[in-house]
């Protein structure tokens, strides 16, 4: 129970609530009934406790803050209502709550099945590659949705699951493609996985402007739920979640593949930045509120931003990442001609989205989102990585490290020093702290690849890279002509490329991308001493 100096304080609180209920009966809500029922239980006012607890259980608000059964079956319930446990009325309520919980989960399952319902035709029997490519490009199988909001379960592994929440445009039309925006929550170290989410948890309060502008501009919103172990910032254990959820959503909703975006606040903004650094291919653009622009699971290779874009909404009183560091980071971004913008809002702390003054930032975000599109087949790519799980970027994939190789002269580290940080002192005042730290850590050796193509000719330079694959699309080459690949100035592949239907199906089932479709793959491996060789259905070259 909430702390008071003595029983008199609890009694006064109970009396205050009851007077308010009497004066304003139309304003009785979940929070009030919950608090007064706990107070009455603590004061051993059994009849009042059961009266208000029953009203709480039977309340049907338009926007519930918790399922009604959770107040009775929650992990804290037996402690909060410990004085009621021996009363037969508690057991009666508990039995009703158990039935309500069962019904709640049954309805979740029904809604989830309806969410995933599609009228999809199997493509496994299509053996002609060109025809299969045409089928992939179609917007097929999508159905209308009965609801605007869906809480969808998500299996992390065989024994652990969480959820993601989907908010659709009001008049969602399955024949129309929509932009998709992910929001990553912060405070990942203090969050827990949840097998369901409610609209009241994600669409309002600090997220109210996401909801407002998404509804105004017909953007699909997705809110995943992470935890200390499974998240998008501090651990790679949960980094797979967002790409997997993208594929699941694309399977059932008509998403514009070139307009998938990701945003977040605090740890969530750092998560959005991490996908930009490590796994950007699915996305068109990245945004962050109060961002700490650093990869916490490995090196931060800032030139990777040149493959996409980032907009950072910062404040000058942020303990999470100080304004002087943001200034230096912006200067670094400008020096490499990155598509990066920072908008500084002075006078605000780390909790910037809490304030109404943050609304213009969301206007900027959605204005950019509406104009921006992914280039699925960029003419040039620059990619650096230190973990082979993230050796993929657009039409380059399966990039493997050569940790014994000597770094090329053009393969340079970019970093800067941070000398000042903001922190709260014992009086809860924000003060400047002198520090001596580098902006980024580099715990492992990295590899880098720079590639470009034009007129069926690919020119690729590598540093500390052992092998890689070049993904091929008919949008990139003339299928009637040979493809030539020059690796570090030497011709290593010179052949025509055909369609590989098995590879096409496997890749499509993984990404559900109807635009960035690969019809074959050329594998390049250094150091074999022969011009090239072919292996299986995939084209393989060794140099």
Residue ranges and their predicted role:
Residues 170-176, 230-266:
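Gly/Ser-rich "nucleophile elbow"/oxyanion-hole loop immediately N-terminal to the catalytic nucleophile
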Residues 250-252, 257-306:
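Primarily recognizes the serine-hydrolase "nucleophile elbow" in alpha/beta-hydrolase
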């Amino acid at each position: 129970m909430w702390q008071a100096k003595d029983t008199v304080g609890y009694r006064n609180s109970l009396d205050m609530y009851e007077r308010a209920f009497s004066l304003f009966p139309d304003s009785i809500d979940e929070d009030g009934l919950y608090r007064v029922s706990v107070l009455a239980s603590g004061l051993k006012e059994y009849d009042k406790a059961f009266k208000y607890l029953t009203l709480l259980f039977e309340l049907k608000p338009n926007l519930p803050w918790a399922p009604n059964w959770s107040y009775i079956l929650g992990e804290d319930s037996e402690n909060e209502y410990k004085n009621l446990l021996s009363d037969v009325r508690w057991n009666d309520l508990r039995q009703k709550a158990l039935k309500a919980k069962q019904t709640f989960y049954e309805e979740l399952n029904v809604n989830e099945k309806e969410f995933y319902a599609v009228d999809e035709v199997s493509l496994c029997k299509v053996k002609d590659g060109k025809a299969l490519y045409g089928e992939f490009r179609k917007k097929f199988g999508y159905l209308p949705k009965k609801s605007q909001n869906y809480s969808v379960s998500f299996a992390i592994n065989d024994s652990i699951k969480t959820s993601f929440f989907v908010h659709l445009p009001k008049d969602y039309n399955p024949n129309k493609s929509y932009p998709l925006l992910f929001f990553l929550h912060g405070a990942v170290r203090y969050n827990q996985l949840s097998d369901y989410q409610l609209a009241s948890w994600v669409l309002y309060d600090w997220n109210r402007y996401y909801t407002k502008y998404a509804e105004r501009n017909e953007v699909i919103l997705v809110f995943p739920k992470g935890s200390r172990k499974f998240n998008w910032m501090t651990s790679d254990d949960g980094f797979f979640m967002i790409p997997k959820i993208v594929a699941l959503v694309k399977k059932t909703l008509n998403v514009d593949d070139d307009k998938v975006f990701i945003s977040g606040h605090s740890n969530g903004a750092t998560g959005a930045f991490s996908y930009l650094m490590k796994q950007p291919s699915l996305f068109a653009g990245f945004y962050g509120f109060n961002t700490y622009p650093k990869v916490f699971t490995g090196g931060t290779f800032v030139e990777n931003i040149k493959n996409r874009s980032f907009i950072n909404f910062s404040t000058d009183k942020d303990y999470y990442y100080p304004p002087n560091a943001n200034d230096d980071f912006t200067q670094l971004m400008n020096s490499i001609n990155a598509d990066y913008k920072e908008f500084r809002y002075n006078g605000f702390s780390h909790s910037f989205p809490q304030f109404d003054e943050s609304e213009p930032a969301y206007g900027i975000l959605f204005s950019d989102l509406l104009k921006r599109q992914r280039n699925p087949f960029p003419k040039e790519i620059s990619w650096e990585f230190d973990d082979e799980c993230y050796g993929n970027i657009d039409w380059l994939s399966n990039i493997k490290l050569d940790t014994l190789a000597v770094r090329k002269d053009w393969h340079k580290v970019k970093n800067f020093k941070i000398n000042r940080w903001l922190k709260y002192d014992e009086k809860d005042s924000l003060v400047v702290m002198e520090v001596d730290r580098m902006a980024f850590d580099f715990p492992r050796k990295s590899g880098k690849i720079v590639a470009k193509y034009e007129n069926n000719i690919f020119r690729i330079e590598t540093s500390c890279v052992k092998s890689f694959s070049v993904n091929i699309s008919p949008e990139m080459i003339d299928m009637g002509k040979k493809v030539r690949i020059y690796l570090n100035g030497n011709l290593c592949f010179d052949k025509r490329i055909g369609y590989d239907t098995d590879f096409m199906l496997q890749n499509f089932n993984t990404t559900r991308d109807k635009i960035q479709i690969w019809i074959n793959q050329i594998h390049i491996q250094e150091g074999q001493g022969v011009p090239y060789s072919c292996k299986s259905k995939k084209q393989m070259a060794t140099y």
